[in-house]
Amino acid sequence: MDREGLKKVQSERLIETVERVYFNVPYYRHKMQEKGLGPESIRSIDDLGRLPFTTKQDLRDNYPFGLFAVPMSEIVRIHASSGTTGKSTVVGYTRNDISTWSEVMARTLTAAGANRNDFIQIAYGYGLFTGGLGLHYGGEKIGASVIPISGGNTIRQIELMRDFGSTVLACTPSYALYLAEA
């Protein structure tokens, strides 16, 4: 796709997103109206800078579900931050969100060189943190063998690397260094 084609797709998707949040999330509608904006004000990706941006405080102020753009009946999974610096930030996912997330992570793994012959050891936490599950689904989508060990348990991590022949390690850079030194 050439640059103009990409800009066209980005503009179309931005317009759709702005319309969806304007009509489905009262908080965003109010923020846009404060800036004198309506959905018709955004016509291309060039207008992105005119939009109010979401801050962590906005997420906290609308805890837990105030920024969801769909009814709760469409939310199939909820993730949240740990809340170590304040109120947790909450994200709700629809089935389509999960599918898109899986596709994005599959592309990310492929771009990094992973393929169906790999053993992907996921040492990110599972649970409310989003890291482990996204890579898990992305790995399955490319046909790789996923080892969902989660975080911590360093001795077991190293044992499984050796026993299973892990070829991809998904974890934080600091934990990778820690494993290398263990």
Task: Explain the meaning of each model-derived region.
Residues M1-A80, T85-E103, R107-A111, R116:
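Nucleotide 5′-phosphate-binding alpha/beta core
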Residues E16, Y27, K35, L133-A182:
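Conserved adenylate-forming
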Residues I42, F53, N117, I158-R162, ...:
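Short secondary-structure transition/capping segments
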Residues I75, I98, G125-G127, S174:
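Short glycine-enriched loops at secondary-structure junctions
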Residues H79, Q121, A170:
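N-terminal Rossmann-like NAD(P) cofactor-binding module of classical short-chain dehydrogenase/reductase
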Residues Y93, A123-Y124, I149, C171:
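Small/polar loops that bind or transfer phosphate-bearing groups
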Residues T110-V146:
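Conserved AMP-binding loop of ANL adenylate-forming enzymes
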